[in-house]
Amino acid sequence: MSPPFKAQVDPLLMKQLIQKSNQKGILHFGIFFLVLFGVGILSFQLLGTYWFFPVYLIYAIIFAFSEAAAHELNHDSVFRSRWLNTSAHWLVCFMSWREPIYSKYRHLRHHSKTSVIGEDPEG
């Protein structure tokens, strides 16, 4: 069996890529919500036509990415500010009908008991 592939990334580039920024986080989050609400409004306006179905499918796919956002916000890795991470996490949890405090601690428990049968809540 061959050893797993490990990408060689320049340490300076890696440091630059993982830096947190409130401005970049707000920009990316803002674009996400702008597109989400724009496609949502468009799908609502197309209700009753055949165009509703493909547009709503696009909306559902975009909405599904809120799960990835919730995961990264759980790790406080989107914004530099903890307050912005927490606020955005609450917003995303509200959108997906999840309780934010339970969600955060459940995910933390997952990382402390990863793949332990009966103890990993996400396993």
Predicted features by range, described:
Residues 3-5, 55-56, 70-72:
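Short acidic/polar alpha-helix capping motifs at helix-coil junctions
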